[in-house]
Amino acid sequence: MTIGKNNKMIQHLNYRVRIVLQDSRTFIGTFKAFDKHMNLILGDCEEFRKIRSKNSKVPEREEKRVLGFVLLRGENIVSLTVEGPPPPEEGLPRVPIPGAAPGPGIGRVAGRGMPINLSAVPAGLQGPVRGVGGPAQQHMAPMGRGVPRAPMMGAPPPGMIPGGMPSMPGNMGRGAPPPMRGPPPSMIRGAPPPGRGGY
């Protein structure tokens, strides 16, 4: 069954309604939804039932229960009566107003990819601190023509160990070479001295 916009049931969504069932129970609540079988959903629902006592002298009394959100099966419904219009807060838009300041309860979409703030790098992903590990900044800069290069170390000449000391036969097999203290001045490659051609 296709439900059109002119259907009477749609016109009464969010209204307060009174529903009577076959067993004479009455439900009053906010009409939220329905389907082709006339199953109904009520919000803020209360149940009223009349209890007859076994004594005919005592009049029947009405018992009220607060139920909340209720699904009523269509085959048990006898009547549906509109009690009143929807409460005023139901008609207000649920869309945030552009000028309103967001409060702590405003829902936000979960991030799915690149973070919104691209300038902030998450902790642990910044790389090494300047001066600790990695090459110096001068070595990482792109080089152009005519710009003097930063000092770089070349390979040691034959007969020299990396520590800058000439190898001695007596030192062989006695452990690791002494720690490097930097290259000797003759090993630093920079601009050629004046009067000498190229490299």
Swiss-Prot record:
Coiled coil: none annotated. Pfam families: LSM (PF01423). Changing R130G: Unable to localize to the pole plasm. It is found in: Nucleus; Nucleus, Cajal body; Cytoplasm, Cytosol. The keyword Cytoplasm applies. Symmetrically dimethylated on arginine residues present in the RG repeats by csul (or csul-vls complex) and Art7; methylation is not required for assembly and biogenesis of snRNPs, but required for pole plasm localization. Keywords: Cytoplasm, Methylation, mRNA processing, mRNA splicing, Nucleus, Repeat, Ribonucleoprotein, RNA-binding, Spliceosome. Sequence repeats lie at residues 111-113, 144-146, 173-175, 195-197. Gene3D superfamilies: 2.30.30.100. GO terms for biological process: germ cell development; gonad development; mRNA splicing, via spliceosome; spermatogenesis. Changing R112L: Unable to localize to the pole plasm. Changing R189L: Unable to localize to the pole plasm. Belongs to the snRNP SmB/SmN family. Plays a role in pre-mRNA splicing as a core component of the spliceosomal U1, U2, U4 and U5 small nuclear ribonucleoproteins (snRNPs), the building blocks of the spliceosome. Involved in germline establishment and development. This is Small nuclear ribonucleoprotein-associated protein B. It comes from Drosophila melanogaster (Fruit fly).
